[in-house]
From Swiss-Prot:
Catalytic activity: a fatty acyl-[ACP] + phosphate = an acyl phosphate + holo-[ACP]
UniProt-recorded name of the protein: Phosphate acyltransferase
Gene, per the UniProt record: plsX
GO CC annotations, alphabetized: cytoplasm
Family under the similarity heading: Belongs to the PlsX family.
Primary location recorded for the protein, binned into one broad class: cytoplasm
Native organism: Anaplasma marginale (strain Florida)
Pathway stated in the Swiss-Prot or TrEMBL entry: Lipid metabolism; phospholipid metabolism
């Protein structure tokens, strides 16, 4: 929902989902509203959570308080709730109410750092999937040597039939066109090697579907995980099991690399002086975003009849702010759902 008056975008925040409590979502919202994490549109927030937990925190962030409404929800989805339990017993939770308001059109999108399985189950139940799409996929934008690429599925569907992987390719292309601005995105299929004999039966069958598709999906072929970050494809398709491992590994390696660099640079007087220069020029100019995995937080549940963005449960305020920014970015791409339906129908 992008309102004409000042292009204001409405976003629902599940304040109870983050591992570190409601302040993650509220401080993250403050970073967006203050411009510390800039968005292209003005943002108005609906914040969902338990009054006793949220209001004391909200009172500390006057800018958020001024640009939001608070909705008291007596329950919350827990990190160990099974999806089936959440569907039956968490209908008054902050997560449920936020997504339900997306369905009603009260807000344009919902952002949650809560239980992934419950979020997917509740979103599918309340919003449903787009016509022709069997299951949603978790998709995000990751950095590469050539810029960025879209990766999906990152954990929603551990096992995927070949036809589902083909749908992910179509969805990923539409997403890449919308958020990366690539007119004819190149699609790769994640595998353990480039040879025809490599990979599981489902991967090999998905390869054949993508290669022989009626419409040209600009299929690159198999992509190894190390090649994905070289930028050989604009979209990398995977089953949720492999995709999630790839994502978590790259995040861990990025964190380890920064840790080692900082340790080595700061081990000498000259190194510490160089670090101060870096902080005063490069990091001030770029916000260090290229080296900070928090700037890539926020994965879209792609294929739903509505916009839901998943933040890492362990996210801090900066990471959560980037998840809000991702929601705003997707809202502004109004024709993406129609494009997915059209391409899946023609596949």
């Amino acid at each position: 929902m992008v309102r004409d008056s000042g292009a204001c975008v409405s976003v629902a925040l599940d304040a109870m989902g983050a591992d570190l409590g409601p302040e993650v979502a509220i401080k993250g919202a403050d970073l967006v509203l203050s411009g510390a994490v800039p968005c292209k549109h003005k943002v108005h927030l609906s914040i969902y959570g338990k009054e006793s937990a949220v209001l004391p925190v909200l009172g500390k962030y006057k800018l958020v308080e001024k640009n939001s409404v608070f909705i008291d929800t007596p329950d919350a989805v827990l990190c160990d709730d099974r999806p089936s339990f959440a569907l039956r017993h968490r209908r008054k939770s902050s997560m449920w109410c936020a997504i339900e308001d997306v369905k009603k059109g009260v807000v344009a999108s919902a952002v949650s750092a809560g239980n992934t399985g419950a979020l997917m189950a509740i979103s599918r139940y309340l919003l449903g999937t787009l016509q022709g799409i069997d299951r949603p996929a978790i998709a995000t934008v990751l950095p590469s040597r050539k810029g960025s690429f879209v990766a999906l599925d990152l954990g929603a569907n551990a096992e995927c039939a070949p036809g589902l992987l083909f749908q992910f390719a179509i969805m990923g292309r539409a997403f890449a066109r919308a958020v990366l601005g690539v007119e004819h995105p190149k699609v790769g299929l994640l595998n353990i090697g480039a040879e025809d004999t490599k990979g599981t039966y489902n991967i090999q069958e998905a390869f054949a579907l993508m290669r022989d598709a009626k419409q040209d999906i600009n299929f690159y072929g198999y992509v190894e995980a190390k090649e994905a970050f070289d930028g050989v494809a604009d979209v990398v398709v995977a089953d949720g099991f492999s995709g999630n491992i790839m994502l978590k590994t790259c995040e861990a390696v990025a964190g380890l690399t920064l840790h080692i660099l900082k340790k080595e640079i700061c081990s000498s007087l000259m190194g510490r002086a160089a670090m101060r220069i870096l902080r005063s020029c490069y990091f001030k100019r770029t916000s260090g975003s290229a080296l900070d995995v928090r700037s890539y937080n926020g994965a879209v549940l792609l294929g739903l009849n509505g916009i839901v963005v998943k933040s890492h449960g362990s996210a801090d305020a900066t990471a959560f702010a980037h998840a809000i920014k991702e929601a705003v970015c997707v809202i502004s791409q109004g024709d993406m759902a129609k494009e997915m339906i059209s391409e899946v129908s023609n596949g």
